Design a protein with these regions (language model features):
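Acidic, metal-coordinating catalytic segment for phosphate/diphosphate chemistry
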Residues: 2-5, 50-155
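Active-site nucleotide-donor binding segment shared across nucleotidyl transfer reactions
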Residues: 11-40, 44-51
Length: 155
C-alpha cells in the first residue's frame, strides 16, 4: 500500500490505543517514510495492559498474541504491535524501525566493540555482560561510535 494510506490506518489505530499508552509511535517502513508499505509496525509502552489488550482485540482478528508482540489484521492490513518498557523503548524503536540492513550494520558495529545489540530490542550488552541504560536512539549510535541517522536515512 502507499505511504499515505498506511499513515491513515496508523492514525486510526493510534487514536484507539493512545488512551492506554504512555508512549506510542509508528515504526518500520512508515517511520522510514518508504513509498510502499507492507504492514504497520507500532511500538508502545502500555499504561494499562489489560485495557490496551481489550482494545487491540477489538481492532480485528488476531494473527499472533504474545507477551511482547501482538499481531492483528485491521481492515485487511497486518498490524504488528510491539510492547516496550522504559528500559527497552529506545532499542526496540530502533530495531523495529529498521531497515534490516541498518540493523545488521549496527549489530556488527556493536560486536566489533565487544558489545551485543539485542535484535529483540532488549538493549545493548557491554563487554562485561551488563545491560547499558539507553535513553534514546541517538545514544545508541553514540555508544557505537557512529553518527546518528534519522529514520528516513536508514534505508
Amino acid at each position: 500500500m502507499k505511504l499515505q494510506e498506511a499513515l491513515s490506518i496508523f492514525n486510526e489505530i493510534y487514536y484507539r490505543l493512545k488512551p492506554h499508552c504512555e508512549k506510542i509511535v509508528v515504526a518500520g517502513s512508515i517511520r522510514r517514510q518508504k513509498a510502499e508499505v507492507r504492514d504497520i509496525d507500532i511500538v508502545l509502552i502500555p499504561t494499562n495492559p489489560g485495557q490496551l489488550s481489550q482494545e487491540i482485540d477489538r481492532l480485528g482478528p488476531p494473527i499472533a498474541d504474545g507477551e511482547k508482540l501482538k499481531q492483528v489484521e485491521y481492515n485487511g492490513t497486518q498490524v504488528d504491535i510491539y510492547y516496550a518498557n522504559q528500559k527497552t523503548w529506545a532499542t526496540l524503536l530502533l530495531i523495529r524501525t529498521g531497515s534490516r540492513e541498518n540493523n545488521i550494520g549496527l549489530c556488527s558495529q556493536a560486536q566489533s566493540l565487544g558489545m551485543k545489540l539485542k535484535a529483540n530490542g532488549d538493549g545493548i550488552i557491554d563487554a562485561g555482560g551488563h545491560l547499558i541504560p539507553i535513553e534514546s536512539e541517538e545514544q545508541i549510535y553514540q555508544i557505537l561510535g557512529l553518527p546518528y541517522h534519522e529514520p528516513w536515512e536508514r534505508g
